[in-house]
Each structure stands twice: as structure tokens, then as C-alpha cells.
Regions:
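Charged, gly/pro-rich active-site loop segments
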Residues: 34-41, 116-191
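Short Pro/Gly-enriched beta-strand edge/turn motifs at strand-loop
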Residues: 44-45, 56-61, 158-161
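Short, solvent-exposed aromatic-acidic interface loops
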Residues: 91-96, 152
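Helix-adjacent hinge/juxtasegments
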Residues: 97-122
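Short beta-strand segments
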Residues: 57-93, 109
């Protein structure tokens, strides 16, 4: 007996095989550089509310186009820089994340809040933000240090502790900049 996931996968593959290449190509032509509209549009939040989530939350999930066609998603610390409108991450200079980005710079980044609970209601109301865009790897040492300082100030208790970490780790990590191409957010109702 097949499990529910296997049955769904089987049906999806069969549906894709049935779809003619002409229909698929027409769909691609119509949707080039256009983003799908949110189905639950009444729950959509404003761009300013999306930015507020990016400013306040400490962690998100960065999804990359991974090896062998499998998505690769990982939790990351981040900093939204209001001066240039980019989202910055830091990490090792080598590894799976960097290999994926070398092959394809398109990413999806998800951040969500813990949410709130209305009095007398069992459900939570988290807010989620999804950002799509392209990531570049910074190469200018001064810019790398500047963005690392900004990231550090979001997470470390004092500026002195940030400066110490920067001195101790200088040149041992990379900084990634996500240029936002599309951003949406919504207030999720779990019921």
C-alpha cells in the first residue's frame, strides 16, 4: 500500500507527463517576471508590515536550488539593511550553501513571527514574510566588515563584543547580500 505522500507524488508526476509541452511553454511565457498573486489576499500584509517583521525577527530560513534538483533550506541569522534594502547573511566561505549559490543565485527567504493568540481562541496568528531574489557574495573587505558589524549589533549585547568577534574572525567568513525582487507577507490563521 502506498502512503499518502507517495500517492500525491505519483499523481503529480502523472499530471505533469500529461501536460503538453506547448501548454507548459505558454504558461512560462505568460508568467515570465510576473509573480503569482496571493490566493488568501485578505490576509496579505503591507510592505511596511513585511519590513517590520524583517527588522524585528532574528532568524529565517534560506532556501536555495540545491544539488540534484533537490531544494536546500537552512536556518540563518540575518540583517535587513534599510539603507540599501538588502538582506545580509554571513557564513563559511565553503560548503553546501556556497556551492548552491555558485550554481544558481536565485533564492527564497522565509521569516515568521511566533504570533499571538486571541483571548479564548486556541489558534495562533503568526505573520510570515517570503522574499524572493538573487544573492551576491561580497568581495570588498571594508563592506564585509561593515555588514558584519550591522549583523553583530542585532545579535550581540554590546558594541564591544561585536568588535572583539570581528577582530578574532576577520577574513574567515563570507557575507551574502540578497537583493529583493519580490516580497509578500501575510497574517496566518492556524484554524
Amino acid at each position: 500500500m502506498r502512503g499518502p505522500v507517495c500517492a500525491i507524488t505519483y499523481r503529480l508526476r502523472r499530471a505533469v507527463r500529461r501536460r503538453s509541452s506547448r501548454t507548459l511553454n505558454t504558461w512560462k511565457e505568460q508568467n515570465t517576471l510576473e509573480w503569482r498573486k496571493m490566493r488568501r489576499f485578505r490576509q496579505q500584509i503591507s510592505q511596511e508590515e513585511c519590513l517590520e517583521v524583517l527588522r524585528n525577527e532574528k532568524r529565517g530560513v534560506l532556501a536555495l536550488n540545491g544539488e540534484n534538483g533537490y531544494p536546500y533550506a537552512l536556518p540563518v541569522n540575518f540583517f535587513y539593511d534599510e539603507e540599501d534594502g538588502r538582506i545580509y547573511f554571513h557564513g563559511a566561505k565553503e560548503g553546501a550553501k556556497m556551492d548552491c549559490l555558485q550554481a544558481d543565485d536565485r533564492v527564497c527567504f522565509l521569516v515568521y513571527t511566533q504570533g499571538f493568540q486571541k483571548e479564548g481562541d486556541w489558534a495562533y496568528y503568526p505573520t510570515s514574510v517570503i522574499v524572493r531574489g538573487r544573492v551576491s557574495i561580497l568581495s570588498d573587505p571594508a563592506r564585509i566588515k561593515e555588514q558584519c558589524r550591522k549583523i553583530g549589533l542585532k545579535y550581540y549585547p554590546t558594541e564591544g563584543s561585536v568588535e572583539k568577534v570581528l577582530r578574532d574572525t576577520e577574513g574567515r567568513f563570507s557575507v551574502l547580500a540578497l537583493s529583493v525582487e519580490h516580497m509578500t507577507g501575510k497574517l496566518v490563521h492556524e484554524s
